[in-house]
């Protein structure tokens, strides 16, 4: 079946983030429901995030020809589905560790590959990235709210059943054919792909990667233990799901209005805004559990995550064509994988001792990013 390329990309983001909207908020609850202790939950989630780091860093960059991006997404989706089925076969921690690593290793490259595909298509025909990417955020809202309700009715087992169907849907979407295929390299217009070593030799790239790794890594306590923390504070799973959804509603609004709001903002200024939001958000989360404050905390997600991601896409999009896939992979690996992985393992061991103090720790992680922003010029988009 052939569909419009922008619709293909929107569906790809939608199904991917529908799965992520189940996994990210609720997987710790599923592991807890299977009898896993908090410190081991931290280890399992951290191991998964390390494999996300490796998948984004090592697997995604192997796709050097843009014409092969869709094929790579299909293979990744298929292997991801095989591993998600593996979660149904046992709950011993060693087996869960194996499946967790395998699932994240192949699930993680799908995001930089999709973003690289978006970047490739933007060079072939014009479209508003924010309005396409927003469908991923909408999917996250729906899945996190829906899963919270299903947990309230059927318990933690609803999490695994829901994500099974969701990942299978992702596989089906990748099998569709977009109307305009990404254009590969030709002999007359060959793109020189730079190495990671060449990229990291540039000071602005190093500062950029460190800055976004801190800002995204500061989400580790929230991603791993907010659901457990809020349930212990007396909130039901459905309320937790709605709180997560609220954060992504704010994300949707910013993605939708990003062109109007931040058209003339440089990546450096966007990172400053994200850093300030991070310090405020995690400080509030570590101090209060009242619902009105949690609503404010979740609205600030549009600053801590969305603005940071927009800054990253702006910084990466301004680079040479041969740098985009590798820099996108490095961003996904270090910011969305490595930084969060390290902080998740630390949070797992410290949560039983610090509880709400974990979120103050996240505020301290975000703070240095304010001073590490790369020097870049503003662009018109």
Tell where the protein language model's regions lie, with residue ranges.
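Symmetry-related core transmembrane helices of the 12-TM Major Facilitator Superfamily/SLC fold
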Residues: 159-175, 357-375
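A late C-terminal transmembrane helix in Major Facilitator Superfamily
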Residues: 325-353
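Structural signature of the two symmetry-related core transmembrane helices
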Residues: 71-85, 269-284
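Hydrophobic core of transmembrane alpha-helices in multi-pass small-molecule transporters
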Residues: 14, 83, 93-111, 213, ...
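Helix-to-loop junctions at the C-terminal end of transmembrane segments
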Residues: 54-68, 151-152, 253-266, 351
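Helix-loop boundary and gating motifs at the non-cytosolic
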Residues: 2-49, 204-243, 309
